[in-house]
Structures are given as structure tokens and as C-alpha cells.
Amino acid sequence: MDTRAQQSPSIGNLPLARRWRSQMWRLLFASLAAAALVNPFVYSPAAAAEPCPDVQVVFARGTFEPPGVGVTGQAFVDALRADLPNKSVDVYAVDYPASLDFARAADGVADARNKVQDVANKCPKTKMVLSGYSQGAAVMAYITTDNVPPNFELPAGITGPMPKSIAGHVAALTLFGKPSTGFLNMLDTNAPPITIGREYGSKALDLCADNDPVCSAGGGGDPAAHGMYAVNGMTQQAAGFATQHV
């Protein structure tokens, strides 16, 4: 009988995929901590404007942010309203967990799709601006997708891509810190690729801060960069882009 004491596995002994995930979570927590330092207050979307506003923002917050549009979302909405003083701008915060369980992003995809299609049907003259931060950027990109990857089973509540006619009601798509392919694979190896549909490409702005490890193709090297979109000028840039399209 082997009586030698067993050592607890260290990070260096874990399989490569698990080490990557461990590193990814450390980066994510560091990024979120940086975002909290930028603005520690909890933001909530403003009260709904008129039943059919001139502009409808649909925003999905990032991982761990409390319900609402989050820090980046509020900065974007504030900038957009400042750019459109003569238009009514309503805001809808996508309802989903925004948790470490990336598979639950599908809840956000279903909720955002339902909202977008509802606005298109009930308020055909309203211009929509779709936007999201981090995991929320993935959610909003997913709702624009053209097709379902082969052998991918659609989650409950999602029947397939939105009708192409919906794209005509969407003025702009602005994304902040959308997970790169490499980062997505660390989050969930079963997640479908994050792609922007062809109908939305010309009206999309996909922003990634320098050295942001979540969205940079090479991984980046500054976790704090992922939490700085509210103050690095990119929310104003995105608002200006959306303003030109509504």
C-alpha cells in the first residue's frame, strides 16, 4: 500500500485547457475590478420614453455587471443622447444572467431578438441601435447572424436567424470589447463563432481597446484595458457613429 502523501494539484500540473481557463478568469476578474474603479456606481437605464421613440437602444451589459446597461452602456447612452438632443432615445437593457456560464448568453440572445422584433413590428419608424459590452457584445453580434453553424443545436427560445427585413429597422450596431475567437474558446469550446451578419456589416462598429486581452487577436496584455471603455473615448466614438446612421 502506498502511504506517500498526495499533493494537491498546482496550476502547473493542470491540463493546458484548464490552465488557459484559469488565466482567462484571472484576466476577467482584473478587468472587472478596473471597471469598478472607473465608476463604482450601479447604473440603471432611464425610464422608458414614448411608446414609439425616435431611437431605441438595445444594450447588453458585460459579465458580472448588475441588471441594467452597466457602466459602458450608460456612458454610451449618455453620449448618444447628447448627440441627439432633438430626438427621443429609449433604452432597453437585455435581460440575461451575464454570468461565468457563457452558455446562458443564449438567454440574452433570445431576449434581445424578441425586443428587436417587437419594436420593428410595433414601431416601424423607430430606428434601433444595438450595442453591447464584453459578453454582451457577443450577445448582440449573435442576434445579427445569418445562419446557424452545422450541427449546432439552437437553445430554447431561438428558432433561427432573425428575418432579413429586421435589418432595415436597425440603424447601427456598436460593440465594445467583443470576445476574440481565442478568448471565446476558453470561455466555452461549444460556443458558435461570433460573427456579424452581412445585412449589418455596413452599419457595425466593432471596437477593441489596445491591449484588451478579451478582444485582441493576440490576447493583449493589459486586463485593465477591458474595463476602460466608459472613459477611453470609445463610447463617444460609438455614439458619433450611431448618430450618423439614425
Feature map (PLM): residue ranges:
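Hydrophobic alpha-helical membrane segments, chiefly transmembrane helices and signal peptide h-regions
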Residues: A34-P40, Y142, Q236-A239
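Active-site catalytic motif of lipid deacylating hydrolases and related acyltransferases
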Residues: P51-K127, L207-T235, A239-Q244
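The alpha/beta-hydrolase serine catalytic core
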Residues: K164-Q244
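Secretory targeting and sorting signals
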Residues: M1-A48
